[in-house]
Amino acid sequence: MFTSIDDVQNKLSEKGYVCSRALATVVFLSLKLGRPLFLEGEAGVGKTEIAKAMAAVLGRKLIRLQCYEGLDASSAVYEWNFPAQMVAIRTAEAAGGSNKDALQTELFSDQYLIKRPLLEAMQPDENGAPILLIDELDRTDEPFEAFLLEALSDFQVTIPELGTIKAPEPPIVILTLSLIHI
């Protein structure tokens, strides 16, 4: 992590991102307090780039959730790999499989789960918690914003077939908003 506000400026500068002292202060405090970093501004001012630079400096994985109108929880958290599940069903049928309970348990396991950005950000990583960039939040609708608030308040999501998945270490969250969409 960063040791001071000057350290934020210096290390980000080494990665090609020059930031003001005010922005460096906000970044430093956000990390020290373990709170999300909320950045708003016009398109092209570097809101997304700071997340990339921070990931490079901190050696963390960057996970980006690009927001758009109509984005829903299933697109942001997870979905099931239906084609692979269908192949497994057909294979079990062809092999004369009769244990439907075992097949159902297998079909709704990690093997067939496609992790989307929010779920991916809650997975353990050897380099520490990832940086979760929620980009252009202003493009989403209120129901998704409410869902996101709930998911990020406890850093956990519930998948009905698997149960609740909680981040062992909360991700570093950066939210961006473009003034042009307000």
Indicate where each model-derived feature is located.
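Conserved Walker B
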Residues: 134-140
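Conserved alpha-helical scaffold flanking the Walker A/P-loop in AAA+ ATPase domains
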Residues: 28, 89-132
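Conserved small/polar residues in nucleotide/adenosyl-binding loops
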Residues: 180-182
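Conserved catalytic/switch belt of AAA+ P-loop NTPases
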Residues: 123, 144-166
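Walker A/P-loop
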Residues: 38-70, 81-82
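Phosphate-binding P-loop
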Residues: 19-21, 28-34, 125-127
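Dynamic helix-loop-helix/coil hinge segments at AAA+ ATPase domain boundaries and subdomain interfaces
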Residues: 2-23
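Structural recognition of the conserved hydrophobic beta-strand(s) that form the central parallel beta-sheet
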Residues: 133-134, 158-160, 172-177
